[in-house]
Amino acid sequence: MLTPVRCRTVPNATVATAARVLRRANLFSRYPRQLGHLRWDSTIAQVLERKGLGVPSTARHNEIGVQQLSEHLYKQLFPRGNTDPPAPELIELAKDHLARHDLLGKTTDKTPPIAFQLPALVGDTLDEHFHKLGVDAAEPFLTHAKQFADAHLPPKPTSWVRRSGWTKYNRDGTTENDVLPQGNMMCFDVEVMYKDNPYAVMACAGTPDAWYAWLSPWLLGETENKAQLVPMGDPTVDRIIVGHNIGYDRAKILEEYDLKQTRNFFLDTMSLHVAVNGMCSQQRPTWMKHKKARELREKAEHESASVELQEVLQGGSLTAEEADLWVDKSSINSLRDVAQFHLNVKIDKDIRDVFAETDRNVILNQLDDLLTYCAADVQVTHQVYQVVFPNFLGVCPHPVSFAALRHLASVILPVNKTWDTYIETAEATYLQMLHGVQERLFTLMERTLDYKADPEKYLSDPWLSQLDWSGQEIKMAKPKKKGDVERPALNQKLPGYPQWYKDLFVKVPKELSGLDEPDKEQENRKARHEFINLTVRSRIAPLLLKLSWEGYPLFWSDQFGWTFQVPREKAETFIQRQMTPVQFEDPDVDDRLRMDVDHKYFKLPHKDGPNARCVNPMAKGYLPYFEKGILSSEYPYAKEALEMNASCSYWISARERIKNQMVVYEDQLPPSQRFVNKDADSNTPIGGFVLPQVIPMGTITRRAVERTWLTASNAKKNRVGSELKAMVRAPPGYVFVGADVDSEELWIASVVGDATFKLHGGNAIGFMTLEGTKSQGTDLHSRTASILGITRNDAKVFNYGRIYGAGLKFASQLLRQFNPSLTEAETTAIATKLYDATKGAKTNRKSLYKRPFWRGGTESFVFNMLEEFAEQERPRTPVLGAGITEALMSRWVSKGGFLTSRINWAIQSSGVDYLHLLIIAMDYLTRRFNLACRLAITVHDEIRYLAEEPDKYRVAMALQIANLWTRVMFAQQVGIQDLPQSCAFFSAVDIDHVLRKEVDMDCITPSNPIPIAHGESIDIFQILEKGDDAKLDDSIVPQSQYAPRLENIPYTPRVPVMQRLRERAEAGDHQAFLRFIRAQITNSDEELKRIIAETRYSDPYGAFSLASNGRVSGNPHQRHAAVHASTKTAAAPSKPSIASRFDSVSQASRIKSVAAGSDEPTIRATKAQGKAMAKASGTKLAASTKDTVLNVTIKKKVAAPEMAAVPSTSSESKSKASATTSTTTTENATASPSSSSNVDAKKTTSKTKPTHKKETEGEPFPSLDDPVIAARLEAVSKTSPGTRASVAAKLDALASFSMRAAAAAEAAVTTTTTPEPPTNPPPVAPKAKEPTTTMAEKVLKPTAVPKNPTPTLTPTTKKSNPTSTPTTPKPVGRPRTTPILPYTAPKKKLPSSAFSKEQKEPMSVSEAVWTASVGGRATTTTATATATGDEKKKTTTTPSWKPVKESLFGRGVYIP
């Protein structure tokens, strides 16, 4: 064992400096040592000043060099140690896999070991720890929630009291005024006049004891202040509040606008439904079609449907969707549809339209009906809750999954009066930029309008000729009297102007719509500008700007969108570049383009592929084409207009949602809920709150959803209003403390792949995630960028899309966006190269695995495991065991259906598990150490807490510990009892006074030119240096009211999801599992064939072990790096290679096969010869092992028996077999010390007629053990390595032919052979010692005796054991010592005579050997003799077979 070397004292030295000093002084060694499942690489002690929290410790590295947790942390997090280390063969396979991708040994993490005292775990494992933390955080809310699901609401009131505030309606019909809702559970709903203001005008709450109704004082005319919030009572009471989309209702509750979190638990039935019966975006269109079809059928059933409708219903066109069984297992999320799905109840929502009114008197006139409608929603919501909540607990059984919802549903964002300034500035900036571009467009419009009197000019212009110039005629009124001057007719819209100009007006004032006087035309045209709807998004804008694609004018097609016109002689260039040509076949549209025979038209590229239409070439997605000159204009300010459109795109899309945010300022709140410090500067803006209306589980992956804050972009210099997040400001005395989980979902995917090897970094993507660097180009994004020839930043889109299940088509389309000049063939080739390098090749080999699998790529293991998750009957996440929605279960979808969504679910839902664990860990640490903080918001992999200034470093430490616990939980649940140090902690914790992505972002935008002061970012080393300011002291006594109570929480260990999958994959055959891993590693077809051959022909009992050279014995892969085993350790025994065993088996099998038709003594003699030959071969192979077999040789003193091998049509072969006597003697050479006895010499007598000269001479079949053949092969193999394998294959083919021919002949021989009665019982060979038993002997032993065994015709001198019973051969224990040679099964067609009658296809060599040894799988014909021998009869016996799962060769066989 390596003794840790402690650092010398290095005053004022950093950790890195200390490490360099030690290396130069040679105070520790870098040589790896084999010790258990870890190698202790270096033993640097961390050098920190004693005022810090760090302590000295030892660095630990795993078997492939990835740095793990320090010894100090490891002992705290894994008190039991590594109870399930990776097997040596898995380590070797991982090294082989990494070496093939040029990753082995390229470890880069050189950080010193991190060590400090952690809060004690509550239990021995993280699973027990988090179970107890989850139960503690969930109670008493979980108990209340279960009780409320079993309870029933009282009947709804039949009449309502018109009184502001709360009114209680008792069961007996009495009412009480000004009584707040009581109890620990309620169902709640509010109604809002949403077009007038965002505040509630009425609310209803139902409890098991009573009903409550609330009316706004403003609604009843008691005040003109519309900002009325609903009070709910004491915020310290533990209470569950159930509602459908409860986040919307929560924003109307008074007590929620407080820095201190209430004890309310908001349970959203919409979220519960989505988690249990939600649908993915791909399913929604099909479901909507099904819904429409169902509504039509119901309409036809209840009404007298029209003939056309009946024909549609009877025509079967509506039943296509019904084939999708999942349709009946899901619904969309509205309360109406959810109630119909779960309760089969239809809700009338028509009266809801009344709330669209802006006059409160309209509401008052129907107040009773509206209150009844509101109460009905409450009642239905509770009924839905009674169904979905128990189902949710079944789908997401872990207490953490429930407890985390309380915090996710109670997020809060503090703001101040700068919020109003932000909206005003952003809107003004947008209007100013819009006005500037519009002025230029108006100028172009006026310039174009000047051509109305010159048709030659506008018809010859390819852009202007597309405009509709008709409608310029002026209708004249008939003169009333003869001789009167004609006057223009009245009520004409802009007479004298072309139609395209008229279409720009929605409405024209009457004074500007008439005929212009010549001297006032320009003045009137300018006055009309304010009524013209002309922006860069208008259809006419690209024509006014005269846009071109590579110099060719743009043309609008009603059928295909924007296209560009190319002369027909130049069209071939664009066709070769895979631009999409269009054919105008519809006679009703695009007449002009269809008649143009001189040009060819091509669609503008679109990000969604060639089938999508481009409807606006001025969209921000086309800005890169402008910058590259592909898209151009005759006017220089066309690019400016495009940039303006891109700059304002965010504000245009989000302005309404941002303006409609419900901000409640503190001057609207009670004094106890205001947060301005008394010592604050008088200039401090008034503060307020925004409660994001979050749906805690808004997608099938259980991700939170919110329209504004969870989709807000980061501040960009060219985007108006993109500083939105920075407008969230911490109140005085508070800060935001948070972090981004580094590559959260990428790490989850990689650790799922690492689980195959039980080793962090064991698969390529895992290694790149942990150890890859941008500088060396070994990280995932750099590898992808180099393959695609794009930037590293752009490569992230490809990587995450692929991890989420996106296919080759997605990569091709995305690549075209980054490089439009590529042809479709080029993009497909590059994308294919990427997927070959990452996902690998798709392979379907049932002999290796039950379903198709990926192999040879850096991510093959990940995708195989993700698809394994997706294909389960009830898929569950690997950590918390959360189930998939019922609509995506495999039983309800077609095979392979929605596979992308199911793979995406496995990753993203695991990411949600990560977030939930992090939140519950923080909840525990907050209550245990009295931290003054609460969750502010989470955005996927970002988490931000609002903390008091004095506690900011302690909260930062708590975040690091929570993250460490969460990562270890993931590692343990996937089967790896360790954690890399590089991912154990957040790379940085941000401490900031505003909400933004990075603390050093200035957040300068067109609407915010003033930079925002930077925040603070600290890593784990800096936190440790803070000392007591960051210490979570165990001596702190938690507040009694909220202290964790973990002592009496029961815990039952559960079987991890990954363990179940692994056990199912191994299915009791570890060697088959290892072969499957090797198949996933290889990208070579030839190597795959060798693995398949090994699967078919090798015994399934062999085991990999470390040989003396440090390699896995028998592994067919070329080793790239050896395991550095200690030289003092004896080499583990190894098995003979498959090819060598083939040689031994083939020799004995051939002798067995040609002996068919001979008498039993001859068969025994040939068996003995075969065993001796096999032993001789096995001795050579096992010479270097501990258990050496007997060195047996064959001496040719007597010629071998002469046997008839294959029946033929010649007269010689048809003659009866005659007897000749031959004696075969086998002797033992000098035996090894471990041998206890020699092999007895065997003498047998046989009579047969010679049929072949070669066999008469006693020459055996050619064998690889023949010295002459071996010497020749050795010479040839130096120049042709595959020669030996080829020869072995041919010899096996010969053996297969002879054995099958013999099987056919055996039946004929047994019908003509007259056996003699036995004089002694059948002999039983003495049990040989296991170390001296060869594979050939095991194969040639019968596994069972038929019901009517053939009697032995000649007595032998062998001892018999009458009590012995036939047993199934046991596995040979000797492991391999030589590598497996390449082997390809012969595919030559054998003659029909080589098959038995029942056999439908040729047998493999392994089946032939088995057939020769145990009697095969066909009906057997045996000769039975009477006891006296006087009467001879032939009987045909069909044994009663029973199946056995796996035979010696992995095939199902049958035994009697």
From Swiss-Prot:
Which Pfam families does the entry mention? Answer: DNA_pol_A (PF00476), DNApol_Exo (PF18136)
- Tagged with keyword Ribosomal protein: no
Q: Which GO terms describe its biological process?
A: mitochondrial DNA replication
CDD domains referenced in this protein's UniProt entry, alphabetically: DNA_pol_gammaA
Q: Which UniProt keywords apply?
A: DNA replication, DNA-binding, DNA-directed DNA polymerase, Magnesium, Mitochondrion, Nucleotidyltransferase, Transferase, Transit peptide
Residue ranges annotated as compositionally biased, kind Low complexity, are 1204-1239, 1346-1371, 1411-1428
Q: Identify the cofactor(s).
A: Mg(2+)
Function recorded in the entry: Involved in the replication of mitochondrial DNA.
Any other noteworthy remark? In eukaryotes there are five DNA polymerases: alpha, beta, gamma, delta, and epsilon which are responsible for different reactions of DNA synthesis.
Its name, as the record gives it, is DNA polymerase gamma, mitochondrial
From which source organism is this entry?
Answer: Neurospora crassa (strain ATCC 24698 / 74-OR23-1A / CBS 708.71 / DSM 1257 / FGSC 987)
